[in-house]
Each structure stands twice: as structure tokens, then as C-alpha cells.
């Protein structure tokens, strides 16, 4: 594989990762399709995916850095407020409660979860996750009990964490599971999305660090330029995607995302079966 070809693949996969990681459409489903079509699979590809996820995580940190520092009691001037936010009552306890269920299950069943990573399971997860998005839109309270992040209760945070366990099923989508769970628990669509992004930082950093540690042996100096291009591309695209997504959900429901998931599931079937 030539250097230019490798860099092109890195850029393409960086765009795919950045666009899909925080949208409720399953980055996993997209990555396995695109990776397969590009012929980029195997241990190096898996390590590459882990590295570019760090770029997506960094985009959330940049986007919500004031809020993240505020969670640990560090404030810089007047806190930035996003739509639906109030006086800064969201605490680190909310984040911890949202993390606990998936962390416990993830550690207990790590090997089993990894064994589920195959096209057929991803295809089913795409469909079930799409149905959950539709259910969340249809069954959510007419008036959210938590219109903003700072209106969320500890119980709501914990229940969102329970829904996040669904994302241990490869292809389900972590953001899809948490946002749907939040809406069903009475959190507004916008606030549930923001909480999902904040929750992603410790969850994804922990999971990515573990995967990177286990994949370290597959890294070579020859891969540095390719990994750097993928990382930077994923960061820039994720930053744009997050901003656009938060504006978009003010105007539309998640039904279009659910339909899109069904289309991706069909694409997985066509490509792999």
C-alpha cells in the first residue's frame, strides 16, 4: 500500500469516524462497511480505529471544556451556557452515575462483548437501535421534566447509564442508547444529547485507553503519518458534526436517524451477505 493511498484511506475513515461517532447512527456499522470496501481490515485497522476515536473525543473536550472543568469545580469566568442549560447544577455525581452500569458490565463481560463484533450482530443492533429511537420519540413525555442539563436528577442520570449498557452490543450506538434513554426518562432531546456528549468523554477515554494498551504491539513508526491524518481528520469533522447536530435537533426529531439506521443495516447485509 503506497503512502498516498494509506493517507487517503486514513482521511476517508477519519471523516466517517468524525461524522458518525456522536450521532445516533452507529460509527461501528459505518466503519466496518467502509473499512471492508477499502480493503482496510485486520489488527492494524482495529488499532487505527482506536486512535482516531481519540480525535473524536478531543472534539467533545474542546466543545464542552468549560462545562467539563465546571464538573470538577473549576470555573473560568461566567460559565458558557448552551440551550436548555441553567445555573450549573449538573455535577460530577451525575456523570459517575451515568458511567457505573456500563463500566461494571463492560469489565465483567469484556471478552464476550468483543466476540459479538461481527457484521451479523452489528446489523441487528442497527435495527434494534433504530426501533429504540422511534420508541423514544413516540413515548417521551409531552413536556420534559428536565428541559436542561442542570434540571436532571441523579435517578435520570443513572437510568441513562443503564440504557448506555445497550451500547455494549456492537453497532447499537452509544449516543443512540443514551439519548433515547434520556428522552424516555423525561429529559429534553437537546439536554439528553448534551449529556450523552459529556458522558462520552470518560467512557470513551477509558475504553479507548484499554483498547490502545492491548493493541500497542501493532503500532509501528511507519504508521505514524497515517494515524496522524486519521486523528486530525476525525477531530475536525467531529467538531463540525457535533455543532451541526445540536442545531439540527432543535428542528427535527430522531425519526430520520432511525430510518437511516435501517438503510445502513440493509447495506451491511448487502456488503457482507
From Swiss-Prot:
Membrane protein topology class: Multi-pass membrane protein
Reaction(s) the record says it catalyses: di-trans,octa-cis-undecaprenyl diphosphate + H2O = di-trans,octa-cis-undecaprenyl phosphate + phosphate + H(+)
TM spans (from-to): 6-26, 45-65, 90-110, 116-136, 190-210, 222-242, 252-272
Entry superkingdom: Bacteria
GO biological process, any: response to antibiotic
Subcellular location(s) of the protein: Cell inner membrane
Entry keyword set: Antibiotic resistance, Cell inner membrane, Cell membrane, Cell shape, Cell wall biogenesis/degradation, Hydrolase, Membrane, Peptidoglycan synthesis, Transmembrane, Transmembrane helix
InterPro entries found in the cross-reference section: UppP
Main subcellular localisation: membrane
UniProt EC number: 3.6.1.27
Gene Ontology, cellular component aspect: plasma membrane
GO molecular function, one term: undecaprenyl-diphosphatase activity
General function of this protein: Catalyzes the dephosphorylation of undecaprenyl diphosphate (UPP). Confers resistance to bacitracin.
Remaining remarks: Bacitracin is thought to be involved in the inhibition of peptidoglycan synthesis by sequestering undecaprenyl diphosphate, thereby reducing the pool of lipid carrier available.
PANTHER family xrefs: UNDECAPRENYL-DIPHOSPHATASE
Family membership: Belongs to the UppP family.
Name the record gives this protein: Undecaprenyl-diphosphatase
Name of the encoding gene: uppP
